[in-house]
Design a protein with these regions (language model features):
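Phosphate-handling active-site elements
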Residues: 28-38, 66-85
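Glycine/serine-rich anion-binding loops at beta->alpha junctions
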Residues: 43-62
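Short glycine/serine- and small hydrophobic-enriched flexible loop segments
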Residues: 23-27, 62-69, 126-130
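Active-site-proximal helix-loop elements at catalytic-domain edges
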Residues: 1-29
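C-terminal binding/interaction regions
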Residues: 81-138
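Short cysteine clusters
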Residues: 17, 54, 102
Length: 138
């Protein structure tokens, strides 16, 4: 089953967008789904329901960061190479969705919904598959 389909099922079962995306990659991350679920709980509805950065996008950034980090705690050395890749992910998400913030995506101020939450979850997963795991359409 595709990650995007797994994530949508999780979202339909009550996970927030960040939880749905992050937990869909538990196996690839080598992490426990319960821990990922807890870690991403506060990222729903644009960070704690503030309508800030989309939760699905935040989760995608967490996945990419986890895969790129060298985890050298005594000498953090991978930030410089990770940040540009995160920026590329942000640009790709914005190109596909039309915005980065939940407020703008949901059209809170304009009344113009750019993308439904389920589609944001799907797009975030597709971008992770393509940009992090180099899998197109799998």
């Amino acid at each position: 089953m595709k990650h995007e389909d797994i994530a949508v099922i999780k979202r339909n079962n009550g996970y927030n967008c960040a939880q749905a995306v992050l937990c869909a990659y538990a196996e690839e991350l080598g992490m426990d789904e319960k821990q990922l679920f807890a870690l991403s709980e506060g990222f729903g509805s644009g960070l704690g329901c503030t309508l800030g950065t989309c939760g699905a996008l935040n989760a995608a950034c967490m996945i990419q960061s986890a895969m790129l980090s060298t985890c050298h705690l005594d000498h953090p050395d991978s930030k410089a190479s990770t940040y540009p890749k995160i920026r590329n992910l942000l640009k790709a998400f914005e190109k596909n969705v039309g915005a980065l913030r939940c407020r703008d995506i949901k059209g809170i101020e304009t009344g113009n919904v750019l993308c439904e939450c389920e589609d944001c979850v799907r797009i975030a997963c597709r971008l992770v598959d393509e940009m992090v795991f180099d899998k197109k359409g799998e």
